[in-house]
Amino acid sequence: MTTLRLLISDSYDPWFNLAVEECIFRQMPATQRVLFLWRNADTVVIGRAQNPWKECNTRRMEEDNVRLARRSSGGGAVFHDLGNTCFTFMAGKPEYDKTISTHIVLAALNSLGVMADASGRNDLVVKTPDGDRKVSGSAYRETKDRGFHHGTLLLNADLSRLANYLNPDKKKLAAKGITSVRSRVANLTELLPGITHEQVCQAVTEAFFAHYGERVDAEVISPDKTPDLPNFAETFARQSSWEWNFGQAPAFSHLLDERFTWGGVELHFDVEKGVITRAQAFTDSLNPAPLEALGERLQGCQYRVDVLEQACESLIAEFPAQKGELRELAAWMAQAVR
């Protein structure tokens, strides 16, 4: 009986694909080696412990219909579009070894005519006259008895959009001697004009089979019907929820300040797991009562635009004379928090 399993998703939904990945990882036998190939439409994927409000331009994402997806592995934020080919390798311990899966990806690239090398913790780079250029980034997750390595290959990604949605860590970039995110990455189409997602998937699949000396038919995973995976519906519901994607952010504080024609406003928020644990409002307005009431009302609310707007709207009945001010405040908060 084969120990290999090959799955290919024809969905571009990041929540669907990450839910499939999670279900397979939880339920795979310890003796199985899995390759899962997939790709996402416009998405910012963040690491398990990251703060989306800090890492991402959430307002721009909302305007451009870019999704946010929190993965279960660590690491940083990345932008996915259909120019990225995503892979996940899974195996039980003690066999799980990310150097094996890295070797398989390098062998696949080599078979296509691209000589790449592993660099640092999680990158694959190609040498160019302008220096090393990253063509793949990865992240990892391990439990007591199994592990996975997942990553992307930059095939024909719209690199100009990286900067639209990500807020690069300036300290991290300075430590690596990098001037911008865009300058250090390269698409495989620059090296292999005309290369397709299907060709890359085929190369990775063949390298996977060659390494283990076995072949297996691919299982196509489709959103047209619920995948036959135990607990998939519950896993998908969690993966697509605001509570997971935003609410799992580490505790943080946010200070908002603005001057309106009717007075200056400062709002101080302490947020834990996406919920406002403390809200303080300061103002030099001649009528501070609505702001004071807003601070009290926001305590315990989710830190999300619709909730903040609703809190302002709900105060209009109590303070009808300040209707215009409260509407202006709601619009400003929505812009500032997105």
Swiss-Prot record:
Q: Which Pfam families match?
A: Lip_prot_lig_C, LplA-B_cat
Q: What is its EC number?
A: 6.3.1.20
Q: Which GO terms describe its cellular component?
A: cytosol
Q: Source organism's superkingdom? A: Bacteria
Decide whether keyword Chloroplast is in the record: no
Keywords, A to Z? Answer: ATP-binding, Cytoplasm, Ligase, Nucleotide-binding
SUPFAM superfamilies documented for this protein:
Class II aaRS and biotin synthetases, SufE/NifU
What EC class does the entry list?
ligase
Per the UniProt entry, what are the Gene Ontology biological process annotations, in alphabetical order? protein modification process
Q: What InterPro entries does the database record attribute to this sequence?
A: aa-tRNA-synth_II/BPL/LPL, BPL_LPL_catalytic, Lipoate_ligase_A, Lipoate_protein_ligase_C, LipoylTrfase_LipoateP_Ligase
Entry keyword annotation includes Nucleotide-binding: yes
Instruction: Name the residues that bind ATP.
Output: R71, G76, A77, V78, F79, K134
Position of the signal peptide: none
Which reaction does this enzyme catalyse, per its entry?
A: L-lysyl-[lipoyl-carrier protein] + (R)-lipoate + ATP = N(6)-[(R)-lipoyl]-L-lysyl-[lipoyl-carrier protein] + AMP + diphosphate + H(+)
List localization entries: Cytoplasm
GO MF term list:
ATP binding; lipoate-protein ligase activity; lipoyltransferase activity
Q: In which pathway does it act?
A: Protein modification; protein lipoylation via exogenous pathway; protein N(6)-(lipoyl)lysine from lipoate: step 1/2; Protein modification; protein lipoylation via exogenous pathway; protein N(6)-(lipoyl)lysine from lipoate: step 2/2
Additional record remark? In the transfer reaction, the free carboxyl group of lipoic acid is attached via an amide linkage to the epsilon-amino group of a specific lysine residue of lipoyl domains of lipoate-dependent enzymes.
Q: Which PANTHER family match?
A: LIPOATE-PROTEIN LIGASE, LIPOYLTRANSFERASE 1, MITOCHONDRIAL
Q: Which family does it belong to?
A: Belongs to the LplA family.
- State how it assembles: Monomer.
Function as written in the Swiss-Prot or TrEMBL entry: Catalyzes both the ATP-dependent activation of exogenously supplied lipoate to lipoyl-AMP and the transfer of the activated lipoyl onto the lipoyl domains of lipoate-dependent enzymes.
Q: What is this protein called?
A: Lipoate-protein ligase A
Organism phylogeny: Bacteria, Pseudomonadati, Pseudomonadota, Gammaproteobacteria, Enterobacterales
Q: Which gene name belongs to this protein?
A: lplA
